[in-house]
Amino acid sequence: MKRNQKIRWAFSGLSFFLCLVVSAQRPGEQVREGKPGREGHVYDGPYKGAYLREVAFPIGGIGAGMFCLEGTGAISHLSVRNSPDMFNEPPVFAAISVKQIPNSARVLEGPVPAWKKFGHRDAGLGSPGATWGLPRFREAEFLARFPFGEVTLRDKELPLDVHITGWSPFIPTDADNSSMPVGALEYSFRNVSTKTMDYVFSYNARNFMTLPDERQAANHIKSIHGGFVLSQDGTSEAPEKKGDFAIYTSDAGVVVDHCWFRGGWWDPFSMAWNNIEKGQVKAVAPVEKDAPGASLFVPFTLKPGEEKKIVLMMAWYVPDTHLRIGDEPTSPKDSTVPDLSRQLPSLYHKPWYSSKFSDVDAVASYWSEHYNELRGYSAAFRDAFYKSTLPPEVTEAIAANLTILKSPTVMRQYDGRFWAWEGSGDSWGSCHGSCTHVWNYAQALSHLFPSLERSLRNTEFGESQNADGHQTFRTSLPIRPVAHNFYAASDGQLGGIMKVYREWRISGDSAWLRGIYPRVKKSMDYCIRTWDPRHDGAVEEPHHNTYDIEFWGPNGMTTSFYLGALESMRAMGKYLGEDVDLYEELYEKGRKFMESQLFNGEYFIQKIQWKGLNAADPVEAARKSFGGGYSAEAVQLLQKEGPKYQYGTGCLSDGVLGSWIARVCGLPEPVDTAKIRQHLLSVYKYNLKKDLTDHSNPQRPGYAIGHEGGLLLCSWPRGGKLSLPFVYSDEVWTGIEYQVASHLIFEGRVKEGLDVVRTCRDRYAGDVRNPFDEYECGHWYARAMSSYALLEALTGVRYDAVERTLYVDSKVGDFTSFLSTATGFGNVSCRGGKVSVKVVYGKIPVEKIMVRGKLLSN
């Protein structure tokens, strides 16, 4: 991606249609118009009034950092130094002044949300340095049309319509252009007065790249065409402190003040505002160092009814970090593939963009040169996605969680491989290593950017797998072989096997499958040997899982994973001509076992077993696990109830999770669908609470509390709740809510599934929580991307690149929906018995269509 390199993409300006006069629909709910949720916000509609207060919409690139556009138009959560920095609201703002109207200067933002006045950092000191004390517009409204966030400002005292559009590139299948460290704010103005008016637009910033305790390294505000660069030098001992942030515009009339008035107290800020109030335009050259802030000005004139758009572009460059995570190998068995990290330029993580651009000027040049093309293709995605006629709560849920891919939760290392946290802490990554048992749930990346998702499989079955087939469920950073000194995650490792099948079907790359299959087989054989040594077809031995504990004895959750992995091995092995007899045998035994031994007539349970196993007793095993060992009281409890942290006779929302994973990977459900459906209906009946006021949650109540509703992770409708069930059992996780909702819909229970979705999104209406930050163990938590499965659940639309076959199985009658494949994206529609495909970008070669299980010729 050199400066003058052209963007490479396959774009089809034409549409192709496959029209089939068949009944492609089932009786079901027709799509409804957006309606207010329980809390009053219209699903997928604008946020205003009380529902605006928490809105913060991420803008940035995949693994490149971000800033958020708040519902008011303010900038916050600036996180561009390769780590999260929540609540970092830098002292930056746009402003407008009208020369013909006294006292007309306004910050181009809406009213400051009330919570900031006392709930923000440094509130007890009066919030020094904040811009909140400046005049601003009286009303604001926010509309999300991912990846675009739109703010409308109004003020009856100012005859000016103002519209702000914030965005950054997001183009499915084009991972590189979607991973740029850039963003843009487009300010549009319309003169609604009856007179010609003269205006001065300005964008103003303190040097927020300056590190507060840095005395050895200089800070600067440098020049760039049409703007300025906020800059902090690094040192030989700490190169990671170097960082640049460019703010500029292509407007021909721009004038730049590179150095605000220098002085003590609030002199620089006060003098900058004095200039804005007077409508003064000042050109000031850069100084050597310690410039407190800078402004760019664009004066313009509008006749009545005329409009003006100013495009403010941002680019940043922080090429170094001090991030190195993971224990080094302790055995020759730990390193079974070449250590590619030795080829990287640093022992520490370096972001992908630093391999493509030499400095911030190169980033800005590329951004400027390709701005219109990148915007056009991002808008093409937006238009295709929002062309959907699916229920608005579904569109809202999916789009809101695509922002995770722009958050500091995700990273790309120097060689382009994808790596991620589980979520983002306030100032740290939360739970490292592309955690397999969390990222199992996330379905968006595999469809939108398949090459990045496939890099995860290459890592899991490469650097993260040892000679025995044991996988570490947390990958090192930089990615390299790592010590295998903890339990494998049963759900993560078995889920990864199913996802190899998924990546094969999405990519159509059978050569890749053939190359990785021996390592996948070694992983599967490890799972059998470790958790099903007696070949019963069930996961019996203690097994670590996504609840950060070990389950003892067979259960529906992990046994469904086991069966799904066995079925995927059978399918892949047969295609490759491999011996799969053992996998078929275990699958049949396990299917019968799960249906006959683990189903109680309403739902699948766990049979707690801790004696007669190969594993050490729970007291010994706990010494290696999270949560520490057994106290004397815990040993007494063990003798009475069995191991801590089990669910036993409980109704687990994840109780058939492996079956859902199989379904979204394109595999058949591993057990009887009638029993699966009954389990899900029991989860809906017992675990979905519309009001949690009387619910006891001694764990982490902030996810759902009080009058709010939510889907509990587990309940015990038939009794039998242990004194210490698994550690998160009383919580509510959005990723599990969407998993259950989409699985219900897959099984034809659309009403119940949408009820779960609405209950979840009602908590994220903007008045209490940020609608674009579903959190669990950290902000922008990856599990919430299970919401993407709602697309396939409602429509049955799935593209198989191996067979070049499109599958359709609508649960909502006629529809138009979004489809993304490895080679392009577009829309699939079902109207009056006809199925059509419109390719918007790239290509989607369809040779066959399966509609409700019936093969139809093109």
Question: Which residues make up each language-model segment?
Answer:
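Bacterial N-terminal signal peptides that target proteins for export
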Residues: 2-13
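Bacterial N-terminal signal peptides
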Residues: 12-21
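Acidic/polar, glycine-enriched structural segments that form the non-catalytic walls/loops
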Residues: 24-40, 46-51, 55, 155-159, ...
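Acidic-aromatic substrate-binding/catalytic surfaces of carbohydrate-active enzymes
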Residues: 62-130, 233-278, 350-364
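Non-catalytic C-terminal accessory modules of carbohydrate-active enzymes
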Residues: 63, 74-76, 82-164, 171-175, ...
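Aromatic-rich carbohydrate-recognition surfaces in CAZymes
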Residues: 97-108, 116-127, 191, 229-232, ...
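C-terminal substrate/ligand-recognition segments
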Residues: 184, 298-303, 310, 431-438, ...
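Extended glycan-interaction surfaces of carbohydrate-active proteins
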Residues: 391-425, 451-484, 530-554, 595-733, ...
